[in-house]
A protein has these predicted regions:
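Bacterial Sec-dependent N-terminal signal peptides
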Residues: 1-24
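N-terminal, polar/Ser/Thr-rich
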Residues: 19-69, 213-218, 225-229
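Extended, low-hydrophobicity, Ser/Thr/Pro/Gly-biased non-transmembrane segments
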Residues: 46, 112-113, 160-232
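Intrinsic-disorder/low-complexity, polar/charged segments enriched in Ser/Thr/Lys/Arg/Asp/Glu/Gln
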Residues: 54-56, 67-73, 86, 157-161, ...
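Beta-strand elements of well-folded, non-transmembrane domains
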Residues: 59-63, 74-80, 91-95, 164-168, ...
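Ligand-binding face of N-terminal immunoglobulin V-set domains in extracellular IgSF glycoproteins
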Residues: 66-102, 106
Length: 232
């Protein structure tokens, strides 16, 4: 009996030692290895891809009213092998929106109505931002939903024109008015979220403490900021 117990204990220890020599790999990472988009060496795989977006933006900040108005076009290219049913646009100033979820308790002077989309056009066709079948806003994420027949195919691109505004709060999170003439404007434009080969869309709501994954997809920027006192 003692010999049987010793043999069993030895087998358990051997099995445990073998198990400890391998590491847990999340299923999403393993799928990326299998698809060839990532490699065990930490470098991109032979099938790696990144979606891209090009921004052409213009903004004007009125220091007296603390109102920022912006407009611009985003050209988004789907380099993934997936047909996209929707896009996500990050409205990061919504972290200060009244009634929104956030990691800090703010006074009224630190709250606003969020980033308000005044108009939107997709592929030169004006759309109603209030159409819930096409647009849905959750926290800092704005979903732009395509019909099943008009999904964004692999290799296709889409242009989105936006006009927006928001009230700059006092001493906000990476975004605020500090004096009558000193402003920190960190998240001033709508940004298309990252869609990657591991998790798909970055759907995480920005609540204040964390840095956001999307610093915009790979692409380019053409931007102009109008100085209000010269534009009067």
């Amino acid at each position: 009996m003692k010999r049987i117990i010793l043999i069993t204990a030895g087998l358990i220890m051997a099995t445990t030692g073998f198990a400890q020599s391998s590491y847990f790999v999340p299923k999403e990472i393993q799928a990326a290895y299998d698809n060839g988009t990532r490699s065990h060496k930490g470098v991109p795989g032979e099938n790696y891809w990144q979606n891209t977006v090009k921004y052409n933006l213009k903004a004007e900040l009125n220091p007296q009213t603390k109102m920022l108005n912006g407009s611009g076009t985003m050209v988004y290219t789907n380099n993934s092998p997936d047909s996209l049913r929707f896009l996500i646009i990050k409205l990061l100033p919504n972290v200060h929106k009244k009634g929104g979820a956030r990691d800090y308790a703010f006074g009224e002077e630190h709250l606003n109505d969020g980033m308000i989309i005044d108009s939107i056009a997709i592929s030169d066709v004006a759309e109603d931002i209030g159409n819930r079948r096409k647009f849905r806003e959750f926290g800092t994420n704005l979903y732009v939903i395509f019909s099943r027949a008009n999904k964004l195919a692999p290799g296709a691109d889409i242009d989105i024109f936006l006009q927006w505004h928001y009230q700059v709060v006092d001493h906000g999170l990476r975004n605020g008015a500090y004096t009558d003439s000193a402003f920190f404007i960190g998240y001033w434009y709508p940004q298309i979220a990252v869609y990657d080969d591991v998790f798909g869309w970055d759907r995480e709501d920005y609540t204040g403490k964390q840095e956001t994954y999307n610093k915009s997809e790979m692409g380019g920027f053409n931007r102009a900021v109008v100085e209000w006192w010269f534009a009067r």
